[in-house]
Amino acid sequence: MLTSANFIESHLIYRYAATILFVFLLLLVTDSNSSSFDVLARSNVNSVWGALTMEVLARLGVETVVVSPGSRSTPLTLAAERNPKLEAVSILDERTAGFFAVGLAKRTHKPVVLVCTSGSAVVNYHPAVLEASMSGTPLLVLTADRPAELRDCSSGQTIDQLKIFGDSVRAFHEMALPEVSVPLLAYLRQTLVHAVNRSLHGNAGPVHLNFPFRDPLAPSIDAEPIIDAHVLELQATVSTRPCECIGTRVGLDTVALERLASHHRGIIVVGAVNPREGDEAFADAVAMLADKLGWPVLSDVLNPLRGHASDSTALICHYDAFLRQPDQLDSLAPTAILQIGALPTSKVLRGWLGSQDAVSFLLTDRPVNTDPLHRVATPLFGQAHVLAEAMHHLKTDSAWTDSWRAVEAMTVASIDSQLEAIDGLFEGKVAWLLSRHLPVGTPVFLASSMSVRYAEYFWSAGNRACPIQANRGANGIDGTLGTALGMAHRGQPTVLLTGDLAFLHDSNALLATRELKGSLTVVLVNNNGGGIFEHLSVSGMGEVFERHFATPQSVQFDTLCQAYGVEYLHAATWDDFVTAIDGLPAAGVRVIEVRTDRKADKMQLNRVLAAD
């Protein structure tokens, strides 16, 4: 008869034997990325879990952990800081931290880890989580929490964190309480592997892991290690590096392809696309596709095409101007529309597309609905290069594309001559000059509202290969500066184009400038209020409009920058501005303020666009 004592003894023998077996297997494993798991990391159960978590994430290709201060997250924070493979960035405000991570992940296409304590700190991640979700940006949100016995009992700094982000995350997992046993350590490792995979593949986006920790949270400096380092080494061994993934080749429906190829008067519309395969490869694929189909390419500014204009003779960028001219519309009416990615920002283009009696095709590599016009459209799931290769057999003439190019050329000449002649400071000319004077390859982040719209109107096509990003997932001004800082971190000198309200809305991110490893130049167009509202009918409501919509703040930006130790320049003329952007600093943050009048900006914009 098996007594309780016998059972316990047998169980302990089994677990000891299993541990010995794992140590033996470890000797057969060669891992060039092995970590030491020092005594401090093995001094208590929470330290073990924190150390293993960060080591596994590092071996999966994660490079950066963005930490906000707090007590409950101590095991994760210390492990991130002590792991030599990881960079731990400390940002006080969780909202800024979240957007910093989004900006970095947008640029690198690798998941960035967020770590925060329990309570309201978690809630401050939500705007960034939403943006990451809607833009397909990989993010790993690790939140610390109280254990079950301290929940729902008025314990301090405790809220319901379970599935707090709702459907905005690709996956949620409530982690088990830390335990130093081989089965639980294996569970921890594989949960992390799944989380990284889930953040990257299929429909990339944020994943939330909630870590409950009991006291003691900090490692015990004088304690003996509670687990052998060899066991942890084995449990940290992973067989894949999901961050190093390749482009997905998806089979396309042959009937749909035949329908697509049968049209000789089609257009390709390319909106916001952040291609994982690389900017140049994406531009080459779209150029090949346009050449084989004989269709023009209407390109938003939020994809690589305008920066690689020599790759395509079919590129059309100024559609927002010439589609306002009634005499142009009939001759340009397509019979087919191929949309790649999201729709461009332009309301004029959206309205025109919605009025067309054309067959529509939607190409996307994410399982999301990208058609707010609700057309009867054929979905094509895959990447641009796969579709281009499927059309390699086609031979078409360029007459249809040439007609679009002729209209584009006349529009470009008109817009360029008008902008060149404008002596007074005008927000639209700021974007135009940036596109012509920034150093080759300069990453650019565009704030929402008018900054991204002026760039769509006036950003010139060329070969400067400037990667351009914006938070067009949720389209908010939240986290504008924080995202730009993340995008610039450990990258090339970067430029942010923003208005005054978007900048002020996230001015708390100036606290994070000391963590920046790199350079960010902020081009701040100060028109003392929300210029986008000037284009709405409510703008005629006088004081009500000014107080509740335009909301002028009258902030002295030189003083604000001085308070945070940020370099400030006032560009009073176009010569001042061009001189400032021709050479970007190698490190630090610099703000270039350009003061304009928002009501005059509106009138000037209407004049430029109406003249074509």
State each model region's role.
Residues 31-44, 352-452, 559, 572-612:
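Phosphate/pyrophosphate-binding active-site segments
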Residues 44-131:
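N-terminal cofactor/phosphate-binding cores enriched in small/glycine residues
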Residues 50-53, 68-72, 76-77, 407-491:
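Active-site diphosphate/adenylate-binding microenvironment
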Residues 63-67, 87-89, 107-146, 333-341, ...:
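A short, small-residue-rich loop immediately preceding and capping a beta-strand
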Residues 124, 254, 270-361, 369-372, ...:
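Glycine-rich, anion-gripping cofactor-binding loops and their flanking helix/strand elements
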Residues 142, 149-163, 457-612:
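Thiamine diphosphate
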Residues 143-195, 300-408, 537:
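Glycine-rich, acidic loop regions that bind phosphate or pyrophosphate groups
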Residues 163, 204-206, 210-249, 580-612:
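Glycine/aspartate-rich loop-and-adjacent alpha/beta segment that forms the canonical ThDP
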